[in-house]
From Swiss-Prot:
Signal peptide bounds: 1-25
Name of the protein in its database record: Probable hydrolase clz13
Glycosylation sites: 61, 89, 286, 422, 456, 477, 581
Pathway connected to this protein: Secondary metabolite biosynthesis
Key words, A-Z: Glycoprotein, Hydrolase, Signal
EC number: 3.5.-.-
Organism expressing this protein natively: Cochliobolus lunatus (Filamentous fungus)
Length: 613
């Protein structure tokens, strides 16, 4: 029996809706309209066959004859798919001529992922009091300097907004190999050191004085000398700022080298040892290290001095060696567990260049509606990408879909954009289809009050590709509620009559034992919001305000829905509407013939627990 009156008058609804945020255009539809999907065996098989065919054709191009490639796709549970391409020109190789899951690559800036994890774990454990602490609190020997180190925070370094130089002590070009080459060197840091005499002459740069050369770190001049923290800090004390701190995103490998020094100062052990003890060993990344393995196990080009180059203090930004298998293991960990119990480390921290790019710790985040071709459904790709000499590595994490991709290449690289598009876009489309089908199978349908409740109330939920789960009909005590809400919302917004009431999961789940002890119920909380069906891209229609808790009724949130699921089977049994103080049972034919008597007994207790919250 309902404890509170279900008779909402137009006047009451008008008062409630007057407290809501402004109208939301369709382009402001909430993201992730579904729980994190799972991928039963063979569910993505057709998609992977298509991706394999595309990738095979792409790397058959003559320009990739000396290129080795490894691509893996993983969920939080297991590796789902892999693609390996060995260089057809075997004479170009000085290492393994067979590429597989255990082939070692230099993974360049993917090293930053481990550094960021380590810093966030130290913060989580209380060894770093605040991510907004100035870095010179931990590394006072950065001063004296013209850089305002007392304004550069740990957070700035993690997000690449410290405003400091990008690279120091990088000499990626070996003059012995390219004395007459054109400008084809990837990853150079200093033209004076990295370019041949001919290349420098073509740029018509002025001569460099001996006084300037004398203050440069020895490892900047001689690649065979590993750079150390003392040399880096000395160089930074004489460096100039690129921007003021926390103003502009500009990549800084030096920033992550400083984070490596921070880890050493806090832990009392070398950076490499700390990463091995806290990340590599616990995750059993058995082929991951900061030292090159024997060439026979690696993807190594002939005359490639980058393979064995000891980058020293730059290990936290570019020094790691790893395999496709180990990186997939690391990515599974990132999907399953955050290094911080406080922060959502997938969330952006600052703007980046362009309208679709953001940055995080240490992510380059790409957010676009292109994969799904639905204007109001953006996909978010959390990436780390980098090049070191002939090596390019990319990781792409899609937490909404419980998927991650790794790409490792060496040789004639080309740009990774094309292959990333050919892998991730079909993958996202297939994963989105699986996720929405799961919502359709598990949540869509009509939920009704039981005869014993003596009230004519129900809710009908449907699924669409652009809005996910939405309320199609809401009946309270015999009255249709949605038309009233639509009219009042339209009146408040000043125009527009086509309102969509969309539900999204909050991931605030709990479990309890059924009353008779014969089943465990999962209480899965969702919230719904209202979206005005206006096209995106027109004027200010893309300006979005968000609130999933805009109104309450007698202290209960009107927009809260709690689905009750049988923990063993995963079947949705009922939904509790908190504001209406009622639990509605899923129609028997839509509940997969779950034993109705047992379900109702469990649901009665579940509803009482929800109302008691």
């Amino acid at each position: 029996m309902c404890l509170l009156s279900m008779r909402f008058t137009v006047a009451i609804l008008l008062v409630l809706l007057s407290h809501c945020g402004g109208s939301h255009a369709t382009s402001c539809t909430p993201g992730q309209p579904f729980p994190v999907p799972s991928y039963p065996e063979s569910s993505l098989q057709e998609t992977f066959e298509h991706i394999f065919e595309t990738a095979s054709g792409y790397f058959e191009n003559e320009s990739f004859q000396a290129t080795n490639v490894a691509i893996e796709v993983t969920s939080s549970r297991e590796t789902l798919w892999s693609f390996y391409h060995a260089a057809k020109n075997q004479s170009s190789q000085d290492g393994s001529t067979v590429i597989g899951k255990d082939t070692v690559f230099r993974v360049a800036r993917v090293s930053k992922l481990l550094t960021a994890i380590a810093v966030l774990q130290l913060h989580d454990q209380g060894h770093v009091s605040s991510l907004y602490d100035p870095i010179n609190d931990y590394i006072p020997d950065l001063e004296p300097s013209s850089v305002q180190w007392d304004r550069v925070t740990i957070w700035d370094l993690l997000n690449n907004v410290a405003g400091i130089l990008d690279m120091c002590s990088y000499t990626l070009f070996d003059k012995r190999l390219n004395t007459n080459s054109d400008f084809t060197i990837d990853g150079y840091a200093d033209i004076y050191m990295d370019f041949s005499a001919r290349q420098k002459a073509d740029l018509n740069l002025p001569p460099v004085s001996d006084a300037i050369l004398e203050v440069m770190p020895a490892c900047q001049v001689d690649k065979s000398i590993p750079c150390d923290s003392a040399g880096l800090l000395s160089w930074l004390r004489s460096s100039k700022a690129v921007f003021n701190p926390h103003q502009v995103n500009s990549n800084s490998n030096v920033g992550f080298s400083l984070l490596g020094i921070l880890i050493e100062r806090i832990s009392g052990v070398k950076y490499e040892q700390f990463i091995h003890q806290t990340i590599i060993e616990p995750l059993q990344l058995n082929s991951t290290s900061f030292r090159p393995p024997h060439k026979d196990s690696g993807a190594v080009l002939q005359n490639d001095h980058t393979w064995s180059w000891d980058v020293g203090v730059n290990n936290p930004s570019v020094g790691l060696y790893s395999t496709p298998c180990d990186i997939s293991t690391l990515l599974r960990w990132t999907l399953n567990k955050s290094p911080s119990s406080i922060l959502n480390w997938f969330a952006p921290g600052f703007y980046a260049v362009g309208s679709h790019s953001l940055i995080g710790m240490p992510w380059n985040i790409f957010r676009t509606t292109t994969p799904l071709s639905i204007p109001n459904r953006p996909t978010t790709f959390n990436t780390v990408v980098g090049t070191l000499g002939p090596y390019t590595s990319v990781v792409v994490v899609m937490p909404e879909y419980d998927l991650a991709v790794s790409l490792m290449m060496n040789g004639a690289l080309g740009h990774p954009h094309d292959i990333l598009t050919n892998v991730t876009f079909p993958l996202i489309r297939a994963a989105d289809k699986i996720a929405l089908e799961s919502v359709q199978d598990n949540y869509a349908g009509t939920y009704k009050a039981e005869p014993g409740q003596k009230i004519n109330s129900s809710i009908t939920l449907s699924v669409s590709s652009d809005h996910g789960l939405r309320i199609s009909e809401l009946i309270s005590n015999g009255s249709s509620i949605l038309p009233v809400m639509e009219r009042l919302a339209s009146s408040k917004s000043g125009g527009g009559a086509n309102w969509i009431f969309q539900a999204v999961p909050t991931f605030l789940d709990s479990k309890h034992q059924g009353r008779r002890g014969d089943g465990v119920i999962v209480d899965e909380e969702w919230r719904w919001t209202y979206v005005l069906d206006k096209p995106p891209g027109e004027g200010w229609n893309d300006w979005c305000l968000s609130s999933f808790d805009p109104v309450t009724y007698a202290g209960e949130p009107l927009t809260k829905m709690v689905f009750h699921k049988d923990a063993k089977s995963g079947r949705v049994l009922s939904v509790a509407l908190s504001g209406y103080n009622i639990t509605l049972t899923k129609a028997v034919q839509e509940a997969d013939s779950f034993a109705q008597g047992d379900a109702l007994d469990l649901l009665a207790h579940a509803g009482q627990e929800v109302l008691a919250e």
